[in-house]
């Protein structure tokens, strides 16, 4: 079984592919309104950053209300792709810091939610949730780009593995 850190590395790789692809499209593409689950591509990407931020804090043991109160700081990036990309890069670095501190990802921890209650999970399962959430929303981005008459970019896990293999020589 591949470990959760590799899946997180895939998540980061795929997000970078999306950001690079969007940077090569007309600038207005990221902000154009579409009829979809989010009003624009930039809104989806900001949502993904917010979710990654929230889950990193859950993994780090931060209390629910403190996470919710601090997640609003990402809102300043609304409508600013450069700021969203910067947040994504900072989050990637923070996740790698987490991985360096938490070496046993199969260890269980307890999370608290005011409505859903208490859940015991492993760090690995929670990281896989982060990756799965990102995969879902990268699919949203691709669908939105197609609505705007632009192609998507392949971000399937197998593309990551092929690229990883090629970079090893």
Swiss-Prot record:
Annotated InterPro entries: DinB, DinB/YfiT-like
Keyword set, alphabetical order: Metal-binding
Superkingdom of this protein's organism: Bacteria
Similarity annotation: Belongs to the DinB family.
Cited Pfam families: DinB
Protein name: Uncharacterized protein YisT
Gene from which the chain derives: yisT
UniProt feature coiled coil, ranges: none
Gene Ontology molecular function: metal ion binding
Entry binding sites for a divalent metal cation: 47, 133, 137
């Amino acid at each position: 079984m591949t470990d959760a850190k590799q899946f997180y590395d895939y998540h980061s790789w795929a997000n970078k592919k999306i950001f690079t692809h969007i940077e090569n499209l007309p600038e207005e593409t990221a902000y154009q309104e579409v009829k979809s689950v989010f009003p624009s591509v930039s809104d989806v990407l900001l949502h993904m950053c917010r979710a990654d931020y929230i889950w990193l804090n859950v993994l780090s043991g931060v209390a629910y209300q403190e996470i919710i109160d601090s997640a609003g700081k990402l809102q300043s990036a609304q409508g600013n792709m450069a700021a969203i990309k910067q947040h994504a890069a900072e989050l990637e670095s923070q996740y790698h810091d987490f991985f360096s501190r938490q070496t046993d990802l199969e260890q269980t921890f307890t999370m608290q939610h005011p409505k859903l209650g208490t859940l015991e999970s492993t760090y690995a399962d929670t990281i896989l949730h982060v990756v799965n959430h990102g995969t879902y929303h990268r699919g949203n981005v691709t669908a939105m780009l197609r609505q705007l008459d632009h192609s998507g970019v392949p971000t399937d896990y197998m593309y990551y593995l092929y690229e990883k293999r090629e970079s090893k020589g």
